[in-house]
Amino acid sequence: MFYNLKRKFEKNLNKHKIRKEVVDDAGTIETDFWKQHSIGCLSKSSPVEAEIYRKFGDDSTKNYPTSIKANPYIGPELGVSDIRVGEEGAADFHTEKGIIVGNIRMGFGHYRISMAIASAAHALGYEPYWMDLNSYGQTTCTKVIGAQNDLYSMGSRLSQKSRLFNRLVWEPMNYEGFRKLTYNAADQKNAELMAPVYANIPKDIPVVATHVWPAQAALHAGMKYVVNAIPDNWQMALHLAEGSIHTVQTHYAYQGYRILNGMQGNDVLNPMPEDALFYTGHYVDHELVSNIETDCAARKQRKEEGKPMR
């Protein structure tokens, strides 16, 4: 449950700073946890980054204005405000009670988890700010995410039509391709392109990201307190964001991510630091669980009386 995350997060809030990165001439990020990545694995991401700059542009020197607007859809119920990047307006962040919910709106699962985080944060007295990195059309960040989303959607649709494509391409990519540290190495480097959207956001406000890209981008931008809420129980290096607190929903996921299971073939890797990974339970909306005992008792009574369960 999110409430476990709150206790863990508050306990570790002051001690979890971004670990200092030492960047060598090849552009390799080298910290204790990341030394298990090979130099070639990390440096190979540079040509990919150059290609993205060529295709989508480089806005690393842009100073996008940031504003806060009321969310007309979930704002009234969950107290959510939108962070708008590239729009002029008031940006009065609540630095004591504010918490950013970072997402990319890629798939309903990530969106649902974002709503659960915002719901629980609101119930606990925090002020959730909704930061959708896929909604800032003028930025390199959104252009990159949008292109990836289009590509993934095309592959997903094709996998439903072609059994051969699904067997030879789609399933291997999702089960093993995204699992590899080499994939994560390039992804972490590319996330630097997304960092400018955080430029004018106070760095002390916690970020809870429901996809790894908002977490990685936040870290590159210098956000000090980043929680990476991993959605998948199947352990994949895709979901790693070094410097963040990683959270998982099941014991199975905890074991797999702790030992980086299968992320470099059959190699036995150094484990994730104990203070970088926490089992929190499922990410569930406050509204769904706050009355769960009474609701379940009512269902049992209806069953005993031969009435409909719902």
List where the protein language model places each region:
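Structural motif
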Residues: 98, 205-206, 245
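A short, glycine/small-residue-rich beta-strand->loop->alpha-helix junction that serves as a flexible
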Residues: 104-115
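Conserved N-terminal ligand/cofactor-binding loop architecture of enzyme catalytic domains
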Residues: 2-77, 115-196
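A short, charged/proline- and glycine-enriched loop
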Residues: 89-99, 222-223, 305-310
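Short N-terminal or domain-adjacent regulatory/targeting segments
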Residues: 47-92, 227-230, 280-306
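Membrane-proximal helix-turn-helix segments that form the acceptor-binding/catalytic region
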Residues: 194-196, 231-247, 254
